[in-house]
Swiss-Prot record:
Record's keyword annotation contains Transferase: yes
Organism: Enterococcus faecalis (strain ATCC 700802 / V583)
Protein name, UniProt field: Ribose-phosphate pyrophosphokinase 2
CDD domains, alphabetized: PRTases_typeI
Gene Ontology terms for molecular function: ATP binding; kinase activity; magnesium ion binding; ribose phosphate diphosphokinase activity
Length: 323
């Protein structure tokens, strides 16, 4: 553990989604994880017990709403309610991965905006602040009427590539779609590299998608960047398209390794040399295939918690360590 934190009113609790990350965060802050238990009744109902006094405390609850999404979300809501009823002074939700973020707008008639519904539930339960990481849609910050601190994984991912000598003019940072251009540009700034964009088009119905590459990638080391990888279909096809276009090597990176369904097999079979991910979502050892390298956001989030508690800006955390 780092130096013991000076203020005993700061308390950190972990629920079940990602306890290893919570332990790293608590270690970075300099506190022990708070004592609580989460159990289920035989019918599946969730019960939370806080096993120490938190009256007047500034509480931070660590919980990603990754799979099982609904169980993890319900755990969080029940915990917030318990903290409120136990007279916590502030209830700060630390959600490294915000589930339901892809449902941020009405893409078709009569669709819900579930990302907003989740925000409403968290606020109504009693949260006073949200701390999260690389939201799928940044406008989700505006779904809350409480303060939202939005951290970026790009500096940590950039540090990984810089430490492995992957930077400069021989590198091209690639966005797998139009929506990720801003994210790719940020990583490119850190790596002092140009960017390219993959433009997916379906020429006509029942014809396979064509991947047009906007930018020069021949003979270059390409670094794909996305906020999350779910089934890995897009990222694998993008990597193969870059290789076919003459790329020397292809690396991929994301903040949130959802990696559901056929994702691991697709990554294994693809042209990707290495996939760099963070530990915002817990990956069991059997899912950490050889191609996956993991960097931790524990210190980043721990530093953010200390800055928030001490009323300091979090903007210095948006830079790489290797300047």
């Amino acid at each position: 553990m780092s130096k013991h934190y000076f203020d005993p009113r700061l308390k950190i609790f972990s629920l079940n989604s990602n306890r290893p990350l919570a332990e790293k965060i608590a270690d970075a802050v300099g506190v022990e994880l708070g004592k609580c238990s989460v159990t289920q009744f035989s019918d599946g109902e969730i019960q939370v017990n806080i096993e120490e006094s938190i009256r007047g405390a500034h509480v931070y609850v660590i919980q990603s709403t990754s799979s099982p999404v609904n169980d993890n979300l319900m755990e969080l809501l029940i915990m917030i309610d318990a903290l409120k009823r136990a007279s916590a002074k502030t209830i700060n939700v630390v959600m490294p991965y915000y589930g339901y973020a892809r449902q941020d707008r009405k893409a078709r008639a009569r669709e819900p905006i579930t990302a907003k519904l989740v925000a409403n539930m968290i606020e109504k339960a009693g949260a006073t602040r949200m701390l999260t990481l690389d939201l799928h849609a940044v406008q989700i910050q505006g779904f809350f009427d409480i303060p939202v601190d939005h951290l970026m994984g790009a500096p940590l991912i950039a540090d990984y590539f810089i430490e492995h000598g992957i930077q400069g003019d021989d590198v091209v940072v690639v966005s797998p779609d139009h929506g990720g251009v801003t994210r790719a540009r940020k990583l490119a700034e850190f790596l002092k590299a140009p960017i390219a964009i993959i433009d997916k088009r379906r020429p006509k119905a029942n014809v396979a998608e064509v991947m047009n590459i906007i930018g020069h990638v021949e003979g270059k080391t390409c670094v794909l960047i996305d906020d999350m990888i779910d089934t890995a279909g897009t990222i694998s096809l993008a990597a193969n398209a870059l290789k076919e276009a003459g790329a020397k090597d292809v690396y991929a990176s994301c903040t949130h390794p959802v990696l559901s369904g056929p994702a691991l097999q697709r990554i294994e079979d693809s042209a990707i040399e290495r996939l760099v991910v963070t530990d915002s979502i817990y990956l069991s050892d059997d899912r950490k295939i050889v191609k996956i390298d993991e960097v931790s956001v524990g210190e980043l989030i721990g530093d953010a918690i200390k800055r928030i508690h001490e009323n300091k800006p979090v903007s210095p955390l948006f830079e790489t360590k290797n300047k």
